[in-house]
Amino acid sequence: MKRPGDGRQESPSSTARPDNRNTGSRGEEIATSFLGQQGYRILERNFRCKGGELDIVARAPGERSLVFVEVKTRRDRSYGPPQLAVTPFKQRQISKAALTWLSRNHLHDSQARFDVIAILLEDGGRHSIEHIVNAFELAY
């Protein structure tokens, strides 16, 4: 997209970033509410460290294991379903962040799993949600 007056091109992705952040934040709110309704106890949201980020850290109902939840949200399916964005590279980043979280919280020996919540935002404020339990294993 051309900027007026300077002849430079601006990439479409840079103009969409604030909207993408809003979409992601909305998805994380939906996912947090969904997990709460399912009986999950939310321990932390948006944990950031040098290696990556964790969207949600929770404890599953009736379980001692921790659940690291990656939330992927899209407004349409033009790039495929949201969960396809959890690439092997992203899985490694999430795994590193999870190991850091466990270390900082002195929970080295805890059992944990990695879930993905895929959200598709629809017209009229509706959404569809898919919770993929054990979506991937710890990746190095």
UniProtKB/Swiss-Prot annotation:
Bias type Polar residues, positions: 10-25
Family to which the UniProt record says this protein belongs: Belongs to the UPF0102 family.
Molecular-function GO term, any one: nucleic acid binding
UniProt cross-references to Gene3D superfamilies, sorted A to Z: 3.40.1350.10
Positions of the UniProt region annotated as Disordered: 1-27
Domain of life: Bacteria
Protein name as catalogued: UPF0102 protein Ppro_1186
Taxonomic source organism: Pelobacter propionicus (strain DSM 2379 / NBRC 103807 / OttBd1)
